[in-house]
Amino acid sequence: MVAIGLTALGLGILGGAGAGRSPAASPDLAAAASISPLASTGRTSTPAIAASATPSPAPPSSPAPSAAQPSPSPSGLIPADARAELERRLQATIDRARTKLAIPGLSATVLFPDGTSWSGASGFARVATKTPATPETAFAFASMSKTFTSAVILQLIDEGKLSLGDPAVKRLPAGLPITVDPRITIAMLLDHTSGLADYFLNPKIDPVLQRDPGRAWTPADALRFVGKPLSAPGKAWHYSNTNYLLLGLIAERATGKPLATLVRERLLDPLGLAATWYQAGESAKAPLADGYRVTSTKPTARPKDLADGSGVAPFRSVVTAAGGAGSLAGTSADIAHWARALYGGDVLGPIGTGILLSDFTKTRGYLPGVSYGFGVQALSIDGHPSLGHSGRLLGFRGAVRDFPIDGLTISVLTNQSRADPGLIVRSLLRVVSPSTVPAPSPRASGAPAASVPPAG
């Protein structure tokens, strides 16, 4: 795995200007609300073992189950009695968060420095049938899918099939219903500096998506909703799903394979991520939670089924329109292991890893305190630098954060698109306090040390 210099690490979220850019400082995350942590320790890296759901206290008006997936006995770094108490506190934290933020159901995973893991769940995967969420429940990854698309592109760069400076228009298939400025490069698509407008922000697209929720969209269908450019190429940072939809098409043309196949063959299968799949091109690999949206994050809020009345989300129209920008789904354990492998240097070669971890820019109008690189967000949480990505799609929201200095990885997936999962990540981080968990050994691999912008 890649060795990341401790003084070099500092995290951020979307966007970046291009190779050779000076990294920007990134302030600590300013939480909009707080969830009281229950204090303690933790970390893991092997898939958690399934456990039966156990009931958890909940308000009488909306009883909701919780399920914990204990890790194997640690190798000696954390005493067994301390680990049991730690896992109890982790479960209590997500139970409290689910109630406080009016989330129907959620799943979370923590990977510890000693190679063990914990996965837990709380609430319901399907409210109408009172189907409990478990660690094996899958949720839509939404924009966390961008980390997979970016990884495929960077692998192709490692292999010499693509270059960061390639004009995107020369790598895209012909006949797309969009004009791509010849100055836009692959690097600009990766770091959101292309200036292209986001098709999902076009107010005309939502009624069309919901009119026929079962329809499978093509990239061309989605690209018809791209508006006028927001800026000249390379001049400003604008988060845009259009960039990653185009990157998926570039990867397909460069290899002659569908993006679903590329993600499966290059990333999921080699890493053993069997409960993750590309929804736009594969069948489900795990039970998928229903998605919900609520009108309030107050504890008394009642989840409302989505527009089709079934509660099933996301709509096929939405996930197929998302393509390389947001079509994957999977478990909290899978996305946590993915993040650890990606940022640890186990997915990309030396060139790709160096690119991924070295080029960030501070963002505006996006997420507080976040800098963005080539499909990776950098963010300091309570002074702990992290790398990862967040995601939100109709009915779902989640986040994954890898803390290389602390040796921790934390993921949270929910089936409610309003509540901020970053608040739960922060609460879990406070529970697994690095001050009480033995420090991890430095990550090492044949890849060169990479730098991340210093946290501000």
Q: How should these model regions be labeled?
A:
Residues 1-5:
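N-terminal export and membrane-targeting signals
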Residues 9-33, 40-41, 46:
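C-terminal region of N-terminal signal peptides and the immediate post-cleavage residues
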Residues 34-67, 71-73, 451:
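Extracellular mucin-like PTS domains
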Residues 101-104, 128-189, 229-243, 323, ...:
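Short active-site loop at a secondary-structure junction
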Residues 124-126, 179-392:
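Short, surface-exposed loop or secondary-structure junction motifs
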Residues 361, 416-456:
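Short, gly/Ser/Thr-rich active-site loops of penicillin-recognizing serine hydrolases
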Residues 386-389, 397-416:
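Short, well-ordered beta-strand elements
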